[in-house]
């Protein structure tokens, strides 16, 4: 059976050819290897029709042009040579489009990413819509790859090398106006006239290339180029800590093209693409992509979710304000905030105002749209306006009696169908629901701070939570732009449970003489975005350590923090960044002065600050405890799958994405090797390093958590 075509050619009466892109039975247009023959057949027809005046590529999808290449193609490649051949095929196809003798215009609406932007770059002109859905970028680096269909060569020549490097090295996506300003597109128009404008452009001669700014022309020359690549290379190395080989290869390939010409550049691009596709880093990053896509499709339970028309929030503090923002501005739902005093409501409203006003200043949002989104948020000091809310999110202090009181008040003042979702980070949901008259509608919904930035939420049903309550809460989290994982109602849930021993071990090393900056630098080098001690300062030492007694009571001595250290720090009024002093000292708010380790911290905790451990030794001790606890969480069914465990660690605490998450990392080392490392550490440092039974059994049998493919579990 012949596959339905994703590319359809229609020639208008004015001799403009319209090529419509519509991948059958898919929400998003993605480029697949099998489409090459379809496009070549169309190109042949275009060349044979001497009456044609121009060509327009346009998508039939409502919200995307082409979202990139189908990543499964790369997974199907068994060798670097196969992946390289895939890149060369893409390059050849783009070259054939570019070589057409008549103007070729890309009419872009929605996501134009990766291979989609490479196709648009191969066209002679580009027009895009002013719709917020329209974004242009080359995100391949986020999968441990580089653009393989000519993007590394065409983009620098179109918009300048420094701007192109920023886009390719970071995967940064541009909005329509940014793309126009940089010369990436020739015009920005309303969606209603996109095709009309693109057709008119196609009737003209090929658009002449826009002269690059003087700065970009200087940087493209030999001297400027040498300086630029040295500076960018240094900055990139500092940012990636050498953990992402794709960034180094991007610099190498772009520089080759500029120094030796496009032919050498294309050759270097294809070879680098093939080699990068086989790296463990790319395989891990692609596994995270597939896992997160999978999680986003997971409804959480088999029951249909209830309707969601409006939400209430209890508490206008930092978390309440952040939750109100994502509910109104991402989910588009009306939000009513209740706080015991007007200042709390004002704080929450200001939180959303600050976020939206920042977008207006950066020209990412119109002032009218800001006002429209803010109008969705209202406040009250009582329960007026709460009667018909579908779901209430509680974000008050971590106090069990207070939260139980909130449940009682919501059941008294809200509708019979209203769901009560607690944002607790440590209290058992079953205890919060203990006195509820409708316990089946009580659930945990644990956000991470800052709410607008952290992608993960933990959804925690207790034993009596209904399947519909789970499904409805998952539905809300997705509308808020979050990646939800459903976890069991056990102390610490998942993320905080695997994080606590990691941070405890860092503090323990600190008390034994390791320096603050050495510990943090070791874990950043390993691949975490910040070190464990800085993380504690950022979260708030008082907040971050509150869970330790809860975990110690539930799981025993392995969760105990070094004696008296935490109390000594808190008694000295050290809360971290929020009050300007923790393990680090911080400059005045609003000033860009760098944080500095406070030398007074060492005598305060009775340490010398003259450690002997190497960076890998420091990282090993922290990370191994995290891995061990993650395996326990699978064993105790705290998480439903290792997929959720990997996603939770990467999105919740910044576990190095290039390692794929705790379970992929264990697989890459081998369970037997992890057991051997932990047994060695247990001999050196104590029983907290004893590998759990599941890990020992897997090591003995040579088992792994994942199969070899990117998406399959054992």
UniProtKB/Swiss-Prot annotation:
Family per record: In the N-terminal section; belongs to the enoyl-CoA hydratase/isomerase family. In the central section; belongs to the 3-hydroxyacyl-CoA dehydrogenase family.
Gene Ontology MF annotations: 3-hydroxybutyryl-CoA epimerase activity; enoyl-CoA hydratase activity; long-chain-3-hydroxyacyl-CoA dehydrogenase activity; NAD+ binding
UniProt subunit comment: Heterotetramer of two alpha chains (FadJ) and two beta chains (FadI).
Annotated organism of origin: Shigella boydii serotype 18 (strain CDC 3083-94 / BS512)
Protein name: Fatty acid oxidation complex subunit alpha
Site location (Important for catalytic activity): 118, 140
EC number(s) on file: 4.2.1.17, 5.1.2.3, 1.1.1.35
GO biological process: fatty acid beta-oxidation
Pfam families in UniProt: 3HCDH, 3HCDH_N, ECH_1
Entry-linked PROSITE patterns: 3HCDH
NCBIfam families: FadJ, PRK11154.1
The reaction(s) this protein catalyses: a (3S)-3-hydroxyacyl-CoA = a (2E)-enoyl-CoA + H2O; a 4-saturated-(3S)-3-hydroxyacyl-CoA = a (3E)-enoyl-CoA + H2O; a (3S)-3-hydroxyacyl-CoA + NAD(+) = a 3-oxoacyl-CoA + NADH + H(+); (3S)-3-hydroxybutanoyl-CoA = (3R)-3-hydroxybutanoyl-CoA
Region (Enoyl-CoA hydratase): 1-190
Subcellular location: Cytoplasm
Gene Ontology cellular component terms for the protein in this record: cytoplasm
Pathway: Lipid metabolism; fatty acid beta-oxidation
Stretch forming the signal peptide: none
Major subcellular site: cytoplasm
UniProt KW Lyase keyword: yes
InterPro entries recorded: 3-OHacyl-CoA_DH_CS, 3-OHacyl-CoA_DH_NAD-bd, 3HC_DH_C, 6-PGluconate_DH-like_C_sf, ClpP/crotonase-like_dom_sf, Enoyl-CoA_hydra/iso, FA_oxidation_alpha_subunit, FadJ
């Amino acid at each position: 059976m012949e596959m339905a075509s994703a590319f359809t050619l229609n020639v208008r009466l004015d001799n403009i050819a319209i090529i419509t892109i519509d991948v059958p039975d898919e929400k998003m247009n993605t480029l697949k290897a099998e489409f090459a023959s379809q496009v070549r057949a169309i190109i042949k027809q275009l060349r044979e029709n001497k009456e044609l005046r121009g060509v327009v590529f346009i998508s039939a999808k409502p919200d995307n042009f082409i979202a990139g290449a189908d990543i499964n193609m790369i997974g199907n490649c068994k060798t670097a040579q196969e992946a390289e051949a895939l890149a060369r095929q893409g390059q050849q196809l783009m070259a054939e489009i570019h070589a057409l003798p008549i103007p070729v215009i890309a009419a872009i609406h929605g996501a134009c990413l990766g291979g989609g932007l490479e196709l648009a770059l191969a066209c002679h002109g580009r027009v895009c819509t002013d719709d917020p859905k329209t974004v242009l970028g080359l995100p391949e680096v986020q999968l441990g790859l580089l653009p393989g269909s000519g993007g590394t060569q065409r983009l620098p020549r179109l918009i300048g090398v420094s701007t192109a490097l920023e886009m390719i090295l970071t995967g940064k996506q541009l909005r329509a106006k940014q793309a126009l300003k940089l010369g990436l597109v020739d015009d920005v128009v309303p969606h209603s006239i996109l095709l009309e404008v693109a057709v008119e452009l196609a009737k003209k001669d090929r658009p002449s290339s826009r002269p690059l700014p003087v700065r970009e022309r200087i940087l493209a020359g030999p001297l400027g180029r040498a300086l630029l690549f040295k500076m960018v290379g240094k900055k990139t190395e500092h940012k990636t800590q050498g953990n992402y080989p794709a960034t180094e290869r991007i610099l190498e390939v772009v520089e080759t093209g500029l120094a030796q010409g496009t032919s050498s550049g294309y050759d270097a691009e294809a070879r680098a693409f093939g080699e990068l596709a086989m790296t463990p880093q790319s395989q891990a990053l692609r596994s995270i992509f597939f896992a997160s896509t999978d999680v986003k499709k997971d409804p959480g339970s088999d029951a249909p979710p209830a309707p969601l028309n409006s939400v209430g929030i209890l508490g206008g503090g930092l978390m309440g304000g952040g939750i109100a923002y994502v509910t109104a501005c991402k989910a588009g739902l009306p939000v009513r905030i209740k706080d015991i005093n007007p200042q709390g409501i004002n704080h929450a409203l200001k939180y959303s105002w600050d976020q939206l006003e920042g977008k207006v200043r950066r020209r990412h949002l119109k002032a009218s749209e800001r006002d429209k989104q803010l109008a969705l948020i209202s406040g009250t000091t009582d329960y007026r306006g709460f009667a018909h809310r579908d779901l209430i999110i509680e974000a008050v202090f971590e106090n069990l009696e207070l939260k139980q009181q909130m449940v009682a008040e919501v059941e008294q003042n809200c509708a019979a169908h209203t769901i009560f979702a607690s944002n607790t980070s440590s209290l058992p949901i079953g205890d919060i629901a203990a006195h509820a008259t409708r316990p089946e509608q009580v659930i945990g919904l644990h956000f991470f701070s800052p709410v607008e930035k952290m992608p993960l939420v933990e959804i925690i049903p207790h034993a009596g939570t209904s399947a519909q309550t789970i499904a409805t809460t998952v539905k809300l989290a997705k509308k808020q732009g979050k990646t939800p994982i459903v976890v069991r109602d056990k102390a610490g849930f998942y993320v905080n449970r695997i994080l606590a021993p990691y941070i405890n071990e860092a503090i323990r090393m600190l008390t034994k003489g390791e320096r603050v900056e050495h510990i943090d630098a070791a874990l950043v080098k390993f691949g975490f975005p910040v070190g464990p001690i800085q993380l504690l300062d950022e979260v708030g030492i008082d907040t971050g350590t509150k869970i330790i007694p809860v975990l110690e009571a539930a799981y025993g001595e392995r969760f105990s923090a070094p004696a008296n250290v935490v109390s000594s720090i808190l008694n000295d009024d050290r809360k971290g960044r929020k009050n300007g002093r923790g393990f680090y000292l911080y400059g005045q708010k609003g000033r860009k002065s760098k944080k500095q380790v406070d030398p007074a911290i060492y005598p305060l905790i009775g340490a010398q600050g003259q450690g002997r451990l190497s960076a890998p030794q420091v990282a090993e001790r922290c990370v191994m405890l995290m891995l061990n606890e993650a395996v326990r969480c699978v064993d105790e069914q705290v998480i439903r799958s290792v997929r959720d465990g990997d996603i939770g660690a990467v999105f919740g605490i910044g576990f190095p994405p290039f390692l794929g998450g705790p379970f992929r990392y264990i697989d890459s080392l081998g369970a037997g090797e992890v057991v051997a490392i932990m047994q060695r550490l247990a001999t050196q440092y104590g029983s907290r390093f004893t590998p759990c039974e599941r890990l020992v059994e897997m090591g003995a049998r040579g088992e792994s958590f994942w199969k070899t493919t990117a998406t399959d579990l054992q």
